Swiss-Prot record:
Assigned GO CC terms: plasma membrane; proton-transporting ATP synthase complex
Entry annotated with the keyword Transmembrane helix: no
Organism of derivation: Malacoplasma penetrans (strain HF-2)
Catalytic activity: ATP + H2O + 4 H(+)(in) = ADP + phosphate + 5 H(+)(out)
Subunit record text: F-type ATPases have 2 components, CF(1) - the catalytic core - and CF(0) - the membrane proton channel. CF(1) has five subunits: alpha(3), beta(3), gamma(1), delta(1), epsilon(1). CF(0) has three main subunits: a(1), b(2) and c(9-12). The alpha and beta chains form an alternating ring which encloses part of the gamma chain. CF(1) is attached to CF(0) by a central stalk formed by the gamma and epsilon chains, while a peripheral stalk is formed by the delta and b chains.
Name listed for the protein in its UniProt record: ATP synthase subunit alpha
SUPFAM superfamilies named in the record: C-terminal domain of alpha and beta subunits of F1 ATP synthase (SSF47917), N-terminal domain of alpha and beta subunits of F1 ATP synthase (SSF50615), P-loop containing nucleoside triphosphate hydrolases (SSF52540)
NCBIfam families: atpA, PRK13343.1
Site (Required for activity): 362
Amino acid sequence: MSINLDKFSNIIKNQIKEYQNKALYSEIGRVINVGDGIVQASGLSNVMLNELVLFENGSYGMTLNLEATTCGIVMLGKFEDIKEGSIVKRTKNVVDVPVGDGLLGRVIDAMGNPIDGNGEIKYDKKMPIEKIAPGVMARASVCEPLETGTLAIDSMFPIGKGQRELIIGDKQTGKTTIAIDAIINQKGKNVKCIYVFIGQKNSTIVQFINTLKQFGALEYTTIVASSASDLPSLNYLAPFTGITIAEEWMSKGEDVLIIYDDLSKHAIAYRTLSLLLRRPPGREAYPGDIFYLHSRLLERSGKINKENGGGSITALPIIETEAGDISAYIPTNVISITDGQLFMLTNLFNSGQRPAIDAGLSVSRVGSSAQINAVKKTSGSLKLELAQYRELDAFSQFGSDLDKETKEVLEHGKKVMKLIKQDKNTPFSQSLEAILLFSIKEKYIRWIPVDYIEDFKEKIIRHFKQQKTILETIDQTKDISQDLFVQIKNEFNSLITSYIKTIPDYNLDFVGL
């Protein structure tokens, strides 16, 4: 076989012409030290803060510390087989998560990966989890109510769309129940919900998912779950994943409710990472930027103007206190960042009051401007009355010799507490709340003995649900006109008259209708 040397020569010449002397460039470093989910690496001289880095075992990490010759990396996956000398590569990307409607009804981890066994998530784009909050001129004032369905909250501490209302209290005081009821009550109200679990038990997360399924609320809810068994780095990232998903909907003009359960564990996770990275500790061993951690997270919630999308993110962060100490470091930080707080009392909860909200310490700083007129007119001085009752009730423990006026205030307070008592997973509509508040405002409950108040409340609910026109009118107009006021009054007069006849040994002459 003859060899065509000219042909070979031409092939070689063409290859030389097309050859480009380009080296495959990749920044790599070496692991110096590894332990407790923290890696110290050298050689990554151009790495960014919060950049994702890839280890040779396929796990990712995130840079949190940048020093002269080394960088501190927190692991986001398995690190057991990473050892000194292992290779680590830059990705030149920050942590980003999928966003969009494909996340509704799904349970994801802090990295945006599905963990509910329902297959891959369909999404159009990913967004970085760190973003600067909207500026002052991009925001709009809070003017629409976010209906929680909890009578005590909607009447005394109303929450507006775009507000940040803290739920604070000890363990087992009903904090999560308020958040769940708020989500259940958004059904049919075109509000998307996000629930962020931070360092919670897996059994608690499963129970929560089952509750949402039971009430058909999972279809408009996204759950970001970072359990107690996850790495501190994932507990740290979870709230930022949640708010990033919410921001995408807000930018499209939609309303979002996001709940962080809870930020106490978030602060502990960040403290753990900071101490392992050898950052200098401050008060209660928290790092110096712990306030900034929560402020930059919560400032991303709010209501934005039409030019920027016109949507809103309402945030309900939860803080767990120890022995009712709201003056501790993290509680005072978050109280100063948020637009109000609902303080849950242990002794109220143990006495059977649900929700166990302290009317004296709780406040909503911007929600009243978003309250509908029907509830605003009927709630009146309810908060003041309850605060007076709590004060007098504590004072009355010291002596039995009370004047008539004090006894009347205490009696009225007991009745109001019974009336605003509400079982979990039974949210009220705003029209029904206005009717129940009407019975307090117009002093109809004074004719009913304390022991019969809860039964009378059920009678009110049944009676007005049958008289649909009154509730429908309030729902449509969001107000109580003079004609409607008279109509409601007549209904109550007939209801009271018929109800007191069913009470044994009741003195009918006592009623002044």
